[in-house]
């Protein structure tokens, strides 16, 4: 007999207010399983407990409710915002969840005598102009590379710029005009290039080309043939870029979303147009509860997408579906953006062209996602069969260790769920206080740091893979011997064969250390190889980053009279270790807090 008390909906509804607000539903474990908002709380919550409820999702949800609570707000707009905040906080299983709600990157043009172009993500605190948002950091990097080939504008940090006494490699490659060194470019000529770059970022390519043609003709008339050739090369490079861009005619600022949804998988494709230019696209796969409708999935996505931090809301949003509460959402986003925001569904002409493209991409992405999931599902099923699992494997983790001759050791922990890599739960550990090269001690420390504070059973893996042989596996066995949780992972060591070739791994079970026979073409082995390779990659990239950071500071750490603050000041002012190595004694003495005498000491130390 169950010792849980059934939720008394009648008693709860009796005193429920008719005001707008947000409601939260909890199960018997006190987990929030659903968050909703309502213009009228009493009417909305009552609808869940009617005798005739057609939705299978709602029926399943209601059966699990142990208790509810509500938060009353002043308006429907406040309810939208609070609902979104609660969904981000609790990640309820019956809500549609946007997995990627981070801010998007911009191209930043600084407010400086000689402005720089840079990648920017986060709050817009620095003075300057921001262009975007771009769909990914890759899109920003590609745009900056393209601009560097066309406009010789610096992309270096201000500290590096200040420390220069001679031009860097970018000047030699003709990718920077060298404003850091007096006499290489006049302020007027540099500003002219900045103005052209600004027009380019605003999508005014024709005006840029017209201006460059005028400059080229003027330079040719004045017999400045070298300058004329540079303008000619700029025009040629710009024409090549323009051939590759799909330029919008009159859509200065617009987001367009395509949508496809089948068998519990939703694919949403966003196209982002700014300043008459398609900046790029991005695929989204929100986590969708069973039996969710198209409208529910898409509206939840739109709200979570635009209410996430540091999002720029465009004037026009083109959607494939009518939103259930479109008027209220338009009003909310208008208030958030501080200007009028409009949704378009019955799109025509250019908007229709973009919408068709977005829908086609969403459909193609959905087909690819379904194929990927079928492949992953088959691999999991095969592994469950081999290991005789009675329940589906929901979570697997794998550990690996990376170091160089025992120094700067880094341990990695990667996580896979039924959909493949779950990168939000990846972790790295910088290993300290062990004998250099002692991989067993490194593994023991990593395991202890990863699992000592685990409270949620869902964060405990069903299978824990250890990249290594019996010695590494023994460390995991020792750690879990006194494990206090009811759920305990199955421990498996993944030992490389003598040739270290894929397909020749030995899988070792904890306890009796029996090996698991798997053929090289086994799809279950392919899944294990995937998680092992991912843990290896994650460990190596972490170790390389740590090694690179150590290189930057190790040469400075042994200099007499140079502590942590002065090291940071040197690195910041000189733009990194290379800047310090190339600096003269007098340039080092210009760093705040560094005397001429100390500058001599620093110079002698790093050059001897």
UniProtKB/Swiss-Prot annotation:
InterPro entries registered for this protein in UniProt: GIY-YIG_endonuc, GIY-YIG_endonuc_sf, GIY-YIG_UvrC_Cho, Hlx-hairpin-Hlx_DNA-bd_motif, RuvA_2-like, UVR_dom, UVR_dom_sf, UvrABC_protein_C
Example GO molecular function: excinuclease ABC activity
Residues covered by the UVR domain: 206-241
GO biological process: one example: SOS response
Pfam families in the record: GIY-YIG, HHH_5, UVR, UvrC_RNaseH, UvrC_RNaseH_dom
Gene3D superfamilies linked to this entry: 5' to 3' exonuclease, C-terminal subdomain, GIY-YIG endonuclease, UVR domain, UvrC, RNAse H endonuclease domain
Domain GIY-YIG: 18-96
Subcellular location: Cytoplasm
Signal peptide as annotated in the record: none
Source organism, top-level taxon: Bacteria
GO CC entries: cytoplasm; excinuclease repair complex
Keywords attached to this entry: Cytoplasm, DNA damage, DNA excision, DNA repair, Excision nuclease, SOS response
Main localization (coarse): cytoplasm
Function: The UvrABC repair system catalyzes the recognition and processing of DNA lesions. UvrC both incises the 5' and 3' sides of the lesion. The N-terminal half is responsible for the 3' incision and the C-terminal half is responsible for the 5' incision.
Family the entry assigns: Belongs to the UvrC family.
PANTHER family in the record: UVRABC SYSTEM PROTEIN C, UVRC/OXIDOREDUCTASE
Oligomer status and interactors: Interacts with UvrB in an incision complex.
Annotated protein name in UniProt: UvrABC system protein C
